[in-house]
């Protein structure tokens, strides 16, 4: 019954980065219970759920993506969680806003893929559509703006903006 009720999640997850890592033997990769819990499972619409809009970044994604040990071990960007947390969107989430972008808004929740994958929500060819989910009328120029910006990378050379970094 669980598999039938969650068939859409399982189908998306099958080709996602975490599932691919598990199939390669990486037992530290996220599974359903890492995000949803084991016993006290709540819908993502429940504000007390770890996977709710206001909690997902800190209580789910941040558990692994803020870990220097895990990001270094698996060759992941070590600053992604911190740069999101320090961004306009991250500050809004930390301030308690629920109608704001979180990790799943851009990366998806069950279909997380590398930005190099043409089917990824964060692949360059898909950014206008991804950003347009919240920013109606988003253009290609809008979509090249960086969300993960740090003082070290806010030089304007790659679409990052030192001014936006300072504002956030």
Language-model features: where?
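Inter-heme linker and motif-flanking segments adjacent to c-type heme-binding CXXCH motifs
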Residues: 1-165
């Amino acid at each position: 019954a669980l598999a039938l009720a969650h068939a859409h999640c399982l189908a998306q997850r099958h080709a996602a980065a975490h599932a691919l890592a598990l199939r390669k033997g990486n037992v530290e990769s996220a599974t359903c219970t890492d995000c949803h819990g084991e016993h006290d499972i709540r819908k993502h619409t429940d504000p007390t759920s770890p996977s709710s809009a206001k909690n997902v970044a800190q209580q789910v994604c941040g558990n692994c993506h803020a870990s220097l040990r895990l990001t270094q071990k698996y060759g992941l960007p070590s600053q992604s969680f911190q740069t999101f947390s320090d961004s306009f969107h991250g500050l809004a989430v930390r301030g308690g806003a629920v109608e704001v972008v979180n990790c799943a808004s851009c990366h998806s929740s069950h279909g997380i893929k590398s930005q190099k994958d043409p089917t990824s929500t964060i692949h360059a060819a898909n950014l206008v559509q991804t950003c347009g989910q919240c920013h109606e009328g988003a253009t290609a120029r809008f979509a090249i703006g960086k969300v993960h910006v740090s003082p070290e990378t806010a030089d304007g050379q790659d679409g990052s903006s030192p001014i936006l970094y300072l504002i956030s």
